[in-house]
């Protein structure tokens, strides 16, 4: 009887630890992805001279294959 109780408690403890670890790893992975995305955006070598799709075209022209749609100050680069 005591052995059965100890085994049940041990299994519950292991299950809780496993679930807790799984939850922590997904949060860290999402955070890591956001951090990597921000680092890529801020990388000095990645400065573009043209706007990509969905970006504003008030301060710089749209990239090749895109045109400025909407009013010039508030327009967005869209595919032709």
From Swiss-Prot:
Any one annotated GO CC term: extracellular region
Compartments reported by the entry: Secreted
Pfam family, one: Conotoxin
InterPro entries (UniProt xref): Conotoxin
Family of this protein: Belongs to the conotoxin O1 superfamily.
Domain notes: The presence of a 'disulfide through disulfide knot' structurally defines this protein as a knottin. The cysteine framework is VI/VII (C-C-CC-C-C).
Official protein name in the record: Conotoxin ArMKLT2-0321
Native species: Conus arenatus (Sand-dusted cone)
